[in-house]
Amino acid sequence: KIAVERDPVKTSFEKWAQPGHFSRTLAKGPSTTTWIWNLHADAHDFDSHTNDLEDISRKVFSAHFGQLAIIFIWLSGMYFHGARFSNYEAWLSDPTHVKPSAQVVWPIVGQEILNGDVGGGFQGIQITSGFFQIWRASGITSELQLYSTAIGGLIFAALMLFAGWFHYHKAAPKLTWFQDVESMLNHHLAGLLGLGSLSWAGHQVHVSLPINQLLDAGVDAKEIPLPHEFILNRDLMTQLYPSFAKGLTPFFTLNWSEYSDFSTFRGGLNPVTGGLWLTDTVHHHLAIAVLFLIAGHMYRTNWGIGHSLKEILEAHKGPFTGEGHKGLYEIFTTSWHAQLALNLAMLGSLTIIVAHHMYSMPPYPYLATDYGTQLSLFTHHMWIGGFLVVGAAAHAAIFMVRDYDPTTQYNNLLDRVLRHRDAIISHLNWACIFLGFHSFGLYIHNDTMSALGRPQDMFSDTAIQLQPVFAQWVQNTHAVAPFSTAPNAAASTSLTWGGIDLVAVGGKVALLPIPLGTADFLVHHIHAFTIHVTVLILLKGVLFARSSRLIPDKANLGFRFPCDGPGRGGTCQVSAWDHVFLGLFWMYNAISVVIFHFSWKMQSDVWGSVSDQKIVTHITGGNFAQSSITINGWLRDFLWAQASQVIQSYGSSLSAYGLLFLGAHFVWAFSLMFLFSGRGYWQELIESIVWAHNKLKVAPAIQPRALSIVQGRAE
């Protein structure tokens, strides 16, 4: 049942025109520049405007429509650029030679400093967003279609803006509607994910498939029938996919295999485009739709059948976990920060998984051979995933400070985790120290042996081997699947698993089996180290958000506070907000190593050119396995070898990028200065470590203290 309140809030432009109207203090106007910072910090901090959960919920709900409007405007802009300022049609006719560009540059700049010639008689910057590839996969064959989609995007943006206004000012949902989780799950699963996937599968079958099949066969884009002709004229489809002549009969008579001409289970890549078989992705979206349509009927609403989340959570207790998940239902239905933290953690993890699938199972035509785009998409999804995971910790900490009520949480999992937080943090701290010293130690050993001229004593594939045997086993299991556990598949899910297959498009490697060795084993442990440190900082921020031995009354000071007064030395930068700040810094560290690993590994072992005799020449000549096993190798053969091209680019067609590269490093270094001033954070970490020493009765008589701001200042 949808419960709404009519006309709850007046629409008033006079009110909106007043800066800071949402806060009594800010509405008075500026006295210092702090007013400007607080205006930005609190405009969307709805918790600070009111304590009324219903009103907060409505504001969040309404703001989501605003967010969607911005996304539609942005997307519309992308499509408009494709229509108005791009060489899309030229690229479509020759995707292996023409480089994608949708960003016109003023003649004053000149093409000679921007990638040289992008092809198709076009002046502009080469783009690496993958939009051209996604447009081809969805069946867009002309710039006119891009114009139409761009206009459609603006119409949807207007609709979203209207919905945001309507659902706050005209018909605002009641709190009970926001808290009806079963109904929400049903509708989101069946509606958004189920019907969303189904409609996309429908579009792929009726529009993308026929158009892509003709494009793959070399038919000129201008000769291909328009999308609506494929939808309305069954004879056109029958020429490409004979099963269309039979209509729905095979579906209702359960002879589904009749449809295997457009819904397949092949595995591997299309040798023409280097992308996944579109008939495989059709099958995938259809299957996903079925799963989510079923999932959207699992939760109990008006009819007394199905799951109740409260019951599930309260039944979830093991022999060692006290009250288990009791009380969590109340948390998730009254604290949107807790809900958001959970969702960000899951979506962040998922986004990182997407990053790894984009290169190992490239979903769009000609994506795999566009190396710049592959690198950009991997970097993009890793970063977005990192931001979301850190955001999860941020909102978990805000939940702890603002929404957590210790009196209602007794002996459930959350309470138990908080009560043994010292054990958790000190163990995690130990794990970080162990991982850091050992993984770095392996590299230092190799550098030393290399310097002493003792290659036979190094950890490498040719001396002391540290093979990633579990990873190799997983790879092999998947590589042999097509002839054993997946008898109907023509190839394994990804060429990277192994085997002898190589897909090359236009003389460039799309994908081939990726070998893993000692070098990967070493850098993998650096990944483990950086990820654990990030988790340590973020988790410590959450578990000590309300109190710590250093500041027992942290909950009263709020989520962010500069220092706990002049009388308490070493309490600066110890708020939950500061932990997010430091966690973000380590997230950058972690992702840098991941992107270094990816770039070098792909250039060394995957990307390159293929001769007519099927001989592969990799970009950096397969030097990863022997060079990346020392710190010196990383510095010399990756960082310097790759950066020197940029540093020496001023006289080449890449000079504009060289200048941007220089500027970006200046911005980075300038912001890093401010980051390195953290002090109080360490004192709290020390408290946990002291606790561990006390536990084992090996505590020193002299208490350790972190340096204060003054002591730690570099004079």
From Swiss-Prot:
Using the record, list the residue span of the signal peptide; answer none if the entry has no such feature: none
Q: Name one GO biological process term.
A: photosynthesis
Keywords, alphabetical: 4Fe-4S, Chlorophyll, Chloroplast, Chromophore, Electron transport, Iron, Iron-sulfur, Magnesium, Membrane, Metal-binding, Oxidoreductase, Photosynthesis, Photosystem I, Plastid, Thylakoid, Transmembrane, Transmembrane helix, Transport
Q: Which GO terms describe its cellular component?
A: chloroplast thylakoid membrane; photosystem I
Q: What's the record's note on cofactor binding?
A: P700 is a chlorophyll a/chlorophyll a' dimer, A0 is one or more chlorophyll a, A1 is one or both phylloquinones and FX is a shared 4Fe-4S iron-sulfur center.
Residues the record lists as binding chlorophyll a': 665
Give the transmembrane ranges.
Answer: 60-83, 146-169, 185-209, 281-299, 336-359, 375-401, 423-445, 521-539, 579-600, 654-676, 714-715
Mode of membrane association: Multi-pass membrane protein
For binding [4Fe-4S] cluster, which residues are annotated in this chain's numbering? 563, 572
The enzyme's E.C. designation? 1.97.1.12
* UniProt binding sites for chlorophyll a: 673, 681
Which reactions is this enzyme annotated as catalysing? reduced [plastocyanin] + hnu + oxidized [2Fe-2S]-[ferredoxin] = oxidized [plastocyanin] + reduced [2Fe-2S]-[ferredoxin]
A GO molecular function annotation here is: 4 iron, 4 sulfur cluster binding
Which Pfam family, giving just one, matches this sequence?
Answer: PsaA_PsaB
Location within or outside the cell: Plastid, Chloroplast thylakoid membrane
InterPro entries for the chain: PSI_PsaA, PSI_PsaA/B, PSI_PsaA/B_CS, PSI_PsaA/B_sf
Q: Which residues bind phylloquinone?
A: 682
Role noted for this protein: PsaA and PsaB bind P700, the primary electron donor of photosystem I (PSI), as well as the electron acceptors A0, A1 and FX. PSI is a plastocyanin-ferredoxin oxidoreductase, converting photonic excitation into a charge separation, which transfers an electron from the donor P700 chlorophyll pair to the spectroscopically characterized acceptors A0, A1, FX, FA and FB in turn. Oxidized P700 is reduced on the lumenal side of the thylakoid membrane by plastocyanin.
Similarity comment: Belongs to the PsaA/PsaB family.
Its subunit composition reads: The PsaA/B heterodimer binds the P700 chlorophyll special pair and subsequent electron acceptors. PSI consists of a core antenna complex that captures photons, and an electron transfer chain that converts photonic excitation into a charge separation. The eukaryotic PSI reaction center is composed of at least 11 subunits.
Q: What is this protein identified as?
A: Photosystem I P700 chlorophyll a apoprotein A1
**Native source organism of the sequence:** Phlegmariurus squarrosus (Rock tassel fern)
* Upper taxonomic lineage: Eukaryota, Viridiplantae, Streptophyta, Embryophyta, Tracheophyta
Name of the coding gene: psaA
